[in-house]
Curated annotation (Swiss-Prot):
Homodimer or homotetramer. It comes from Xylella fastidiosa (strain Temecula1 / ATCC 700964). One of its GO terms (cellular component) is cytosol. There is a cross-link at residues 101-248 (Tryptophyl-tyrosyl-methioninium (Trp-Tyr) (with M-274)). PROSITE patterns: PEROXIDASE_1 (PS00435), PEROXIDASE_2 (PS00436), PEROXIDASE_4 (PS50873). Keywords: Heme, Hydrogen peroxide, Iron, Metal-binding, Oxidoreductase, Peroxidase. Its EC number is 1.11.1.21. The keyword Ribonucleoprotein does not apply. Disulfide bonds: none annotated. CDD domains: catalase_peroxidase_1, catalase_peroxidase_2. Residues 213-232 are annotated as: Disordered. This is Catalase-peroxidase. HAMAP family: Catal_peroxid.
């Protein structure tokens, strides 16, 4: 047989691959239309990216975990220094604390996104942020343990637990640990990290105030500039970091200007945006900086590209360091070279001893970064890799903020004088930091879950009564139907209660009945006057039912959801379809004292396209805000679409406005919204140059037929959403529309029922 590899006169030219290019290299829709609506955000984290399959139950796997053995292995790892990445001071504790902190510290209360709950530090962009240099090594050090325990411990849980064990192995008593973080398998696309196009840029989030970190040769005047800028600048919402690629603040000071007071203002703003008060902020900074060190052995130009830009042979590791050995005493991360205490592997009060025990003068690290050295001090700080050397005490600009800001100073001096209270405050703040995005306590797993209930966990009372049965529900539905409340009142109230849920940090929802409490009862979007009428009526129904003998009761939280279902059933019946809206009792009513008003304030919607509501002054196009709201509600694009169509014809719009109510059968669960939106007999035009509101007129006569908002019209304009709208506008779609609406409605009503999982 002829060797097909042999050359011949006919095949002398080099063989070419017939597939020269792939879709990755081609021009994409986003390149042509950069402002295209991101409907794809509603289809993240599908089973197609999950190797464990849709039947995998992490909670069940976690229960099989030998938790004590896992912790023993983590304790052993802390002092098992590896030649490929030696431990500072012979202990990896500082590195693992930083890893856990930076995993959890991306959380922001504004939209609940970020945080440790999904193990996102493994993926871009977080795995390549400038603030996360060397954390790739920390995760590789954990890999043998992750490999050993497999799917019984998620990466998300392991990263946080490693930080906890690091603290414990250095003599600190933690507040506890809860498992339950479920890994995702691709980067979150819905998180807005900012619009800067350069690492460490801040020009957009502060309105062209900063362009990135700089290190001026002369810092004279830099303090005045930083102070002026930090006084006047406003950080863009919902961001909680001062520069692209940082977790919180620039440790050198605002824009690299070494001004402790200006740094304090940045610290207060960013920590508040992740729900930390001043005491928690001081405890976290001082507690975290009791351990370990920063690394700035040489200038940053010795460091190679981040993991996502690395070559194949680097195997996902980044920041290859060409200086010296590239590790140990030659390590470069932040560019700062600071060890805060004499006991970097042991819990102590040394941070405050040094903070107040010395005067400080400005200096630079070997990498050229601004830091502070103690005046007239002896070299008492251990070297991380040479026991024969001692170093001078050093601090960061952001550390000195705790001394020179008057509020932080008072707290710091109190902690200095009361180390037991400092330890307790740090333990609680650390637990809050690492568990803030986990939602209610019912999601917590493991033997170290603290018994104490904390207000930031949005507690709800346990069920202490006998739940209603099917016969009771029929009687209650009859009472609701006879109460005089209309379909729109029932539906809009239930939606207002349940739709506060955020899949990001698992907060909000109908359980707890907080719609009846401050601040939610007074939110503009919840129509306080109408709400008070509905709640008063439902309370009468509740009181009458609960007055019966025995222990059977219904909460107001349950009754609100049940009443919404009654409204949907009535509207479906008007459309000729008799069905039962799913309802599972078991919600309880929280008390006002169990509700942190300031913590709940960020849950207030400044836009809710499902109710055709946008707060005045909002500049983001409302259709984009609709996608954001739908994503927080964990809705798919079809679910979002059918809910919009249904809520419009049920009269759920805030204020009863007629925009988007494309029907003459208000209160009937019809598919009229889609039929009339897609009617080519209607011609649409904006009412004003702002293009917020549109009129739909008869193409022949010019007569006004409808008015609609951007949210309404996008279901006919956007090609993806129009394709979905066409399904529900078809002649044979009425029953499918109703049943799909009920399924999506029920999903939203039960999003926070983690007790049912």
């Amino acid at each position: 047989m002829r060797d097909m590899r042999a050359s011949s006169p006919e095949t002398t030219s080099a063989v070419k691959c017939p597939f020269n290019k792939t879709a990755v290299e081609g021009t994409h829709n986003k390149d042509w239309w950069p402002n295209q609506l991101r409907v794809d955000l509603l289809h993240q984290h599908s089973n197609k990216s999950n190797p464990l399959g849709e039947t995998f139950d992490y909670a069940k796997e976690f229960q099989k975990l030998d938790y004590a053995a896992l912790k023993r292995d983590l304790h052993a790892l802390m002092t098992d220094s590896q030649d490929w990445w030696p431990a500072d001071f012979g202990h990896y504790g500082g590195l693992f604390i930083r890893m856990a902190w930076h995993s959890a510290g991306t959380y922001r209360i504004g939209d609940g996104r970020g945080g440790a709950g999904r193990g996102q530090q493994r993926f871009a962009p977080l795995n390549s942020w400038p603030d996360n240099v060397s954390l790739d090594k920390a995760r590789r050090l954990l890999w043998p343990i992750k490999k050993k325990y497999g799917q019984q411990i998620s990466w998300a849980d392991l990263i946080v637990l490693a930080g906890n064990v690091a603290l414990e192995s250095m003599g600190f008593k933690t507040f506890g640990f809860a498992g339950g973080r479920v890994d995702t398998w691709e980067p979150d696309q819905d998180v807005y990290w900012g619009r800067e196009m350069t690492w460490l840029g801040g020009d957009v989030r502060y309105g062209a105030v900063s362009e990135g970190v700089h290190h001026p040769d002369e810092h004279r005047g830099a303090k005045e500039k930083a102070s002026k800028n930090s006084d006047s600048r406003v950080l863009e919402n919902p961001l909680a970091a001062v520069q692209m690629g940082l977790i919180y603040v620039n440790p050198e000071g605002p824009d690299g200007c070494p001004d402790p007071l200006a740094s304090a203002r940045d610290i207060r703003e960013t920590f508040a945006r992740m729900a930390m008060n001043d005491e928690e902020t001081v405890a976290l900074i001082a507690g975290g900086h009791t351990f370990g060190k920063t690394h700035g052995a040489a200038p940053a130009d010795n460091v190679g590209p981040e993991p996502e830009a690395g070559e194949l042979e680097q195997q996902g590791l980044g920041w290859h360091n060409r200086f010296g050995s590239g590790k140990a005493g030659d390590t470069i991360t932040s560019g700062l070279e600071v060890t805060w205490t004499k006991t970097p592997t042991q819990w102590s009060n040394d941070f405050f001893e040094h903070l107040f025990g010395y005067e400080w003068e400005l200096t630079k690290s070997p990498a050229g970064a601004y830091q502070w050295v103690a005046k007239d001090a002896a070299a008492t700080i251990p070297h991380a890799h040479d026991p024969s050397k001692k170093l001078l005490p050093m601090m960061l600009t952001s550390d000195l903020a705790l001394r020179f800001d008057p509020v932080y100073e008072k707290i710091s001096r109190h902690f200095h004088a009361h180390p037991d209270q400092f330890a307790d405050a740090f333990a609680r703040a650390w637990f809050k930091l690492t568990h803030r995005d986990m939602g209610p306590r019912v999601r917590y797993l493991g033997p170290e879950v603290p018994a104490e209930e904390l207000i930031w966990q949005d507690p709800v009372p346990k069920v202490s009564h006998v739940l209603v049965d099917a016969q009771d529900l029929l009687a209650l539905k009859h009472k609701i139907s006879a109460s005089g409340l209309g379909i729109s009142q029932l539906v809009s109230t239930a939606w207002a209660s349940a739709s506060t849920f955020r899949g990001s940090d698992k907060r909000g929802g109908a359980n707890g009945g907080r719609l009846c409490l401050a601040p939610q009862s007074q939110w503009e979007v919840n129509q306080p006057q109408q709400l008070s009428v509905v709640l008063e009526t439902l309370r009468r129904v509740q009181a009458e039912f609960n007055a019966q003998a025995g222990d059977k009761r219904i909460s107001l939280a349950d009754l609100i959801v049940l009443a919404g279902g009654v409204g949907v059933e009535q509207a479906a019946k008007r459309a000729g379809i008799v069905l039962e809206v799913p309802f599972v009792p078991g919600r309880t009513d929280a008390l006002q004292e169990q509700t942190d008003v300031s913590s709940f304030a960020p849950l207030e919607p400044f836009a809710d396209g499902f109710r055709n509501y946008v707060k005045e002054g909002c500049v983001v196009p409302s259709e984009h805000l609709l996608i954001d709201r739908a994503q927080l509600l964990t809705l798919t694009a079809p679910e979002m679409t059918v809910l919009i169509g249904g809520l419009r014809v049920l009269g759920a719009n805030v204020g009863g406005v007629k925009h988007g109510v494309f029907t003459d059968r208000l209160g009937t669960l019809s598919n009229d919204f889609f039929i009339n939106l897609l009617d080519m007999g209607t011609e649409w035009a904006p009412v004003s140059k702002e293009r917020h509101l549109f009129e739909g007129r008869d193409r022949r006569t010019g007569a006004l037929k409808w008015t609609g908002t951007r949210v309404d019209l996008v279901f006919g304009s956007n090609s993806l959403l129009r394709a979905l709208a066409e399904v529900y506008a078809a002649v044979d779609a009425q029953e499918k529309f109703v049943r799909d609406f009920v399924a999506a409605w029920s999903k939203v009503m039960h999003l926070d029922r983690f007790d049912l999982v």
